[in-house]
Amino acid sequence: MFNILKQVGDYAKGSVQAAKYIGQGLAVTFDHMRRRPVTVQYPYEKLIPSERFRGRIHFEFDKCIACEVCVRVCPINLPVVDWEFNKAVKKKELKHYSIDFGVCIFCGNCVEYCPTNCLSMTEEYELASYDRHELNYDNVALGRLPYKVTQDPMVTPLRELGYLPKGVLSPHDLPKGSQRAGKHPQEILEEMETTSTKSE
């Protein structure tokens, strides 16, 4: 008899504990339901990277002196520098330069230690491709001018999630009236109506 009562008591305790955990989970769910969305609707919305963002490396062929400092400071000896020694002017002549972004860890050592500043980090981060060999950028691909999110007219650049006010660690901690990333469909329709009336 005592054993049955103990089992019933344990079952009741377990039920109360399970109900408590379910209640805690639902409280978190309902708390998030009251908040504005923070989802970035990629690729139609993109975050503006911070000033020190380490994206695709930009290379200026004319500035490079083929010193190979970038290869020596790279933790994985990644940049491939092909050069020939010109006996007439007694200097190295750069023939080819390439970086494989499928292997690069974007540490920025090559940019920091380059004596002629021919390497720089850009804001580009969309390097995905179907073939891994396409990630091996030669001096022509590296020399392409960097692309910025704010230059694309089809994309809405979002600054809110990239730059939060001082002391705010989460976008949810912002005051209720402040602008947030992610708009309700009604707000988007209102914006479209106002822009169409202004253009007329």
Swiss-Prot record:
PROSITE patterns: 4FE4S_FER_1, 4FE4S_FER_2. One of its GO terms (cellular component) is plasma membrane-derived thylakoid membrane. Pfam families: Fer4_7. The keyword Repeat applies. It comes from the Bacteria. Residues 172-200 are annotated as: Disordered. This is NAD(P)H-quinone oxidoreductase subunit I. It comes from Gloeothece citriformis (strain PCC 7424). The gene is ndhI.
